[in-house]
């Protein structure tokens, strides 16, 4: 038998082959739906809806000196 050292503190370490036993099963992660459900309940709903208005300019901004050059 091995003598306990300061690094093992008397506990026997598992070798990689020992961790493949059937008793050492990994825990399954919960379904994604179950994880998202609590966060949806925490969301606050507002009384008023939010309206965003965006304006898009088709024309380029032209400097006054460029405009004069084009007209001449």
From Swiss-Prot:
Positions of region (Disordered): 1-40
Biased composition (Basic and acidic residues): 10-35
Pfam families: SPAN-X
Family statement drawn from the similarity comment of this UniProt entry: Belongs to the SPAN-X family.
Name listed for the protein in its UniProt record: Sperm protein associated with the nucleus on the X chromosome N1
Organism of origin: Gorilla gorilla gorilla (Western lowland gorilla)
